[in-house]
Swiss-Prot record:
PANTHER family: 54S RIBOSOMAL PROTEIN L1, MITOCHONDRIAL, LARGE RIBOSOMAL SUBUNIT PROTEIN UL1M. Keywords: Repressor, Ribonucleoprotein, Ribosomal protein, RNA-binding, rRNA-binding, Translation regulation, tRNA-binding. One of its GO terms (biological process) is translation. Belongs to the universal ribosomal protein uL1 family. One of its GO terms (molecular function) is structural constituent of ribosome. Signal peptide: none annotated. InterPro entries: Ribosom_uL1_bac-type (IPR005878), Ribosomal_uL1 (IPR002143), Ribosomal_uL1-like (IPR023674), Ribosomal_uL1/biogenesis (IPR028364), Ribosomal_uL1_3-a/b-sand (IPR016095), Ribosomal_uL1_CS (IPR023673). Binds directly to 23S rRNA. The L1 stalk is quite mobile in the ribosome, and is involved in E site tRNA release. Protein L1 is also a translational repressor protein, it controls the translation of the L11 operon by binding to its mRNA. This is Large ribosomal subunit protein uL1. Part of the 50S ribosomal subunit. GO terms for cellular component: cytosolic large ribosomal subunit.
Amino acid sequence: MAKLTKRMRVIRDKVDSTKQYDISEAVALLKELATAKFVESVDVAVNLGIDARKSDQNVRGATVLPHGTGRSVRVAVFTQGANAEAAKAAGADLVGMDDLADQIKKGEFNFDVVIASPDAMRVVGQLGQILGPRGLMPNPKVGTVTPNVAEAVKNAKAGQVRYRNDKNGIIHTTIGKVDFESDKLKENLEALLVALKKAKPTQAKGVYIKKVSLSTTMGAGVAVDQSGLSTTTA
């Protein structure tokens, strides 16, 4: 049996794996246990009551967190003409068409998000085998293929998170950094859960959001009591 590290022993002693913590208590615990030499991210895992084997029950989308993620996001935009100028004005880091595609083909990936206007998909489509495996391929379902590229750039810069369930029906994403104020992490989590509820497949039956767990980059998962969260959809 592998020997537990000092950090793992502390986590084991502090975290009750059978308990659902109030959000404030959960965040306080994460902050206490975040002892890495860098500012850890606060990640969330949401277990959904879906059958991930069925395509009509898969959940995918994007939402802007009210307090961002704490990450600096570099955005590349495939577009031209007036849209190119609008994208630059909105803060895009890279804007182009064939020239941008050539950079990517050479292995230059100086960006975290790729956005494209519909007329640019003829160029972007050639990059599917490069961008797809990296999770960077623009998709209208998450708002990264859009005629309004300026708005998409602003959303990406403002802290938009993209989500997609895995084969077990679990959503994994980030809701900020461990040095965020507790209320901001709570509001970010609530915004994500509201977005997930709005994206609920009509075919999904029974309890939809089954479990919510928070963790830091190097920490253990802490289950959150959903009754302490405001997730009513409009």
